[in-house]
Amino acid sequence: VRIEKRYNDEIGELTDTINYMAGEIATTEQMKNEFISSVSHELRTPLTAIKGWAETLMLDGGNSPDTMNKGVKVIVTETERLQQMVEELLDFSRMQNGHFTLQSATMDILAELGDAVLIYSEKAKRETKEIIYDEPEMLPFVFGDKNRIRQVFINVIDNAVKYSSAGDRVTIKAYESGENVVVSVRDTGVGIKQSDLAKVKTKFYKANHTRRGSGIGLAVADEIISMHGGSLSIDSEGEGLGTTVTISLPAQEKN
């Protein structure tokens, strides 16, 4: 619904503002609908795989060790995917309701980053992708929730691997910059259109609809980093030119 603009004075400006707000509401509603459709699809896909392989194993999996191993591997992988998605949805709900809290303490950011890199190193290798991480010997400690920070690293590295193709590289760096500890994750994957860059951290938004994902992971990650007094930025030169995610957190003051 749009209001016809009849004047070029204050009334006209008000008309423009109302029309703009109406457009934003319509866009948000469309994004929510797309989000619900996307999540339904994302839940259905692993459930279908789990059900299919469970039925296969019940029928004749015991007669073939290869079939058994393959089926169990698929079930475990898809179950982990479901678990990650449910956790993202729960976190998103808590943030919306103001019930999301941090359990902060002095933490070693390299330990959490190292765990996240380890989780995806083998996955990347299986997909003929390369993760390059030259871990520094030491960085200042950070005051934060180590589980939530690790969650952010996992989300960002997962995206970098997911939106890359065979032969692509994911380069991870951690360093001190002024009073901050910085982690950058750069991939040589599909990249992001300039018109999408400002929207990728928006709730429900998916820049690439051909890859799996709920569209809320980055919104949750961005909120977690903001709650730590830090920043999460996303840069890309364009489609096919890769993406760089930079996470900056305030270093804990040395006594």
Regions found by a protein language model. Give the residues of each.
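Conserved glycine-rich
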Residues: 229-230, 234
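Conserved catalytic submotifs in the C-terminal HATPase_c
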Residues: 4-6, 103-108, 125, 130-140
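Short conserved segment of the HATPase_c
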Residues: 192-204
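Short beta-strand/loop element within the Bergerat-fold HATPase_c
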Residues: 167-179
